[in-house]
C-alpha cells in the first residue's frame, strides 16, 4: 500500500492484458507471453506514427506462416527479423515493417518455439478482391491459429480470430454503443439498396473499402444518400455536384464483360476517387442506386437545441449538419451518416423503420 501522501498508481495495462489473454484463450492461443505481446501491439497501433506520420498497418499473429497464403489469400512472404516473445520484439517489428505495410502489404508475426519471426506478406490490392482481414472475418476454422489486430480509427481497434471470436477495443473516450464498422454497414446498405443484382455485392465492396478508409481520417466525415430520382441541387446550398453522377455499377458491369486492364483500372480509380471525396470538407453525396453524385456540399442547418442562456447550438459543426440531414431522412434523403474526430459514428437510414 502506498504511504500517506504518496499517489497510488492506476494502470489499465493489466486490465487490457487480461482481456486480450481471455480473447487469445478463446482462440486456442493461450500464454502470458503472447498476451503481453498482443496487448503491446494494441496499444502501439492505437495511435501509431513514424516521423509524425500516422500509420495504420494490419498485423496478423499466427503459429504457422503458411496459413497466410493458404487461408487468407496472401501471395508472397518477405521475412524481416526475429526476436524473443516479448513486447520489445513487437515494437521492433512495427518500427521495421509499419512504414512498408500499406496498400497490399500486411505485417505478420509468427510464433516459433520461444521466438517471434516477423515480416510482411502481400495481398491483392484490387478493390473488388477481399482483403486478408475480410477473409479472416468470414472463416471459423478451429485448426487454424491466427488473430489480426487492425486500427479502425485512432484509438479504436479490432481483434479478430480464425476461430470466430472478435473484440472491439476502445482506448479513447468515444461512445461505444455502436462500433464504427457496424454503422458503416448501414451506410453501405443505404448507398446500394437500389442497385440491381448481380452488381450489388461488388458495389457494396467498393463502398465498404472506401468507408473503412474514411475511418482513418482525423477530421471526421459526413455522407448524404439521395434516392435514385433525387435532385442534388435542391438539397444543398453549395458544393461540387456532378452534372452526370458516376455510375459505379456500370463500371463494374463493364469490367466483368470485358475484364481487361483498362476496365480494371477504371474500377480501381473510382474507388480512389470516392476516397478522395470522403476526405474533402463538407458532405459527400451518394445515391441509393450506387451512383456518386458530388462532394464538398453544405446545407442550411435547421433550428436546433441551444445551450441555456446562450445562442450557441449544442455540438460541433458536423454534428449540427448531421442533425439537419437526419431531419430529411425518409423525406428527401435515404440516409445520413456522421463520423466524428473522436471515433464516434452514427447513421440514420430509412431501412431502420422497416426492421421489426
Task: List the model feature ranges, each with a label.
Residues 1-356:
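Divalent-cation
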Amino acid at each position: 500500500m502506498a504511504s500517506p501522501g504518496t499517489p497510488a498508481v492506476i494502470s489499465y495495462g493489466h486490465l487490457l492484458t487480461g482481456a486480450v489473454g481471455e480473447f487469445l484463450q478463446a482462440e486456442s492461443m493461450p500464454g502470458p507471453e503472447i498476451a503481453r505481446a498482443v496487448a503491446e501491439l494494441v496499444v502501439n497501433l492505437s495511435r501509431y506514427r513514424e516521423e509524425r506520420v500516422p500509420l495504420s498497418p494490419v498485423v496478423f499473429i499466427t503459429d504457422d506462416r503458411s496459413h497466410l497464403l493458404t487461408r487468407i489469400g496472401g501471395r508472397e512472404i518477405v521475412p524481416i527479423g526475429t526476436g524473443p516473445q516479448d513486447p520489445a520484439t513487437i515494437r521492433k517489428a512495427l518500427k521495421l515493417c509499419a512504414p512498408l505495410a500499406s496498400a497490399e502489404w500486411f505485417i505478420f508475426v509468427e510464433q516459433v518455439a520461444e521466438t517471434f519471426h516477423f515480416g510482411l506478406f502481400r495481398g491483392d490490392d484490387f478493390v473488388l478482391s477481399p482483403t486478408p482481414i475480410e477473409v479472416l472475418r468470414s472463416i471459423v476454422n478451429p485448426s487454424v491459429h491466427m488473430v489480426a489486430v487492425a486500427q479502425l480509427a485512432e484509438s479504436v481497434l479490432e481483434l479478430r480470430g480464425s476461430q470466430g471470436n472478435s473484440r472491439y477495443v476502445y482506448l479513447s473516450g468515444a461512445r461505444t454503443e455502436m462500433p464504427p464498422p457496424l454503422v458503416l454497414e448501414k451506410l453501405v446498405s443505404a448507398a446500394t439498396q437500389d442497385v440491381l443484382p448481380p452488381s450489388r455485392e461488388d458495389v457494396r465492396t467498393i463502398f465498404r473499402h472506401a468507408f473503412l478508409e474514411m475511418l482513418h481520417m482525423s477530421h471526421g466525415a459526413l455522407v448524404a444518400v439521395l434516392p435514385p430520382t433525387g435532385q442534388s441541387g435542391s438539397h444543398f446550398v453549395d458544393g461540387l455536384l456532378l452534372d452526370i453522377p458516376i455510375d459505379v455499377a456500370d463500371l463494374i458491369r463493364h469490367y466483368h464483360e470485358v475484364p481487361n486492364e483498362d476496365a480494371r483500372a477504371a474500377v480501381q480509380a473510382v474507388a480512389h476517387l470516392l476516397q478522395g471525396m470522403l476526405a474533402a470538407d463538407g458532405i459527400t453525396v451518394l445515391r441509393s442506386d450506387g451512383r456518386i453524385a458530388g462532394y464538398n456540399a453544405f446545407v442550411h442547418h435547421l433550428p436546433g437545441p441551444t445551450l441555456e442562456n446562450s445562442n450557441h447550438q449544442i455540438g460541433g459543426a458536423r454534428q449540427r449538419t448531421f442533425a439537419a440531414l437526419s431531419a430529411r431522412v425518409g423525406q428527401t434523403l435515404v440516409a445520413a451518416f456522421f463520423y466524428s474526430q473522436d471515433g464516434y459514428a452514427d447513421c440514420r437510414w430509412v431501412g431502420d423503420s422497416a426492421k421489426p
